[in-house]
Amino acid sequence: MINDQGRRRIRARQPEIDRRLRSPRPDGRRGLTLLGRLPAHVSRNIEFTLQQLAAVAPEQYYYSSPDLHITVMDLLAARDDLRLSAKQLARYRAAVGKIVATIPPIHWRLQGMIVSPGAVLVTGDYGPELAELRRRLRSELPALHLPVAERYPTVSGHVTVARFTHPISAPDRFLAAIKENATTNYGHFTMHALDLVVHDWYNRQVESCVRLPFVGDGR
């Protein structure tokens, strides 16, 4: 289980270090991602927990509220050499938007916090619409000669809230804070639209963004 693996690595002071976050150079990788934004009350609740973690391990990287998101699918995983023409991007927008427009809004409950070997995650429960959306994207986009190149097939729904940039100096205290929030309820919400973005690995630099509504949403 990912949480057990993460806890073992942290106890051994051997987390997976994200060295790009330690570089003064901006992240040059770009990817095409379909993601969901968090409502303000959920982001605020997560930030309260991140303040608690930062008090124990200030040397790590913690996502700011605007950067928090749920990755629905990495259509083209972020890499250094990704280049999309305006025509290619328009084709993805049209095709993905058409699929999203047939899917009902997705209901979410974010509750609990776990660690992977390289990150801290807030876990989510969600409606069956998410799996159906992913299935259709994986089958219908390639049929339209629009490649799908995921880093790995996304099957869960979570929010990455922190990444490790250094060994954790107080692993027991850090893991205690994670355990304290293992059942924390960060909030319920309904996702009425998704964003199709070209962005860097950490969602700090967004170069292109279009909002795609679910079926029946007039927002």
Predicted regions and their residues:
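Histidine-dependent nucleotide/RNA phosphoesterase domain, centered on the 2H-phosphoesterase fold
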Residues: 1-219
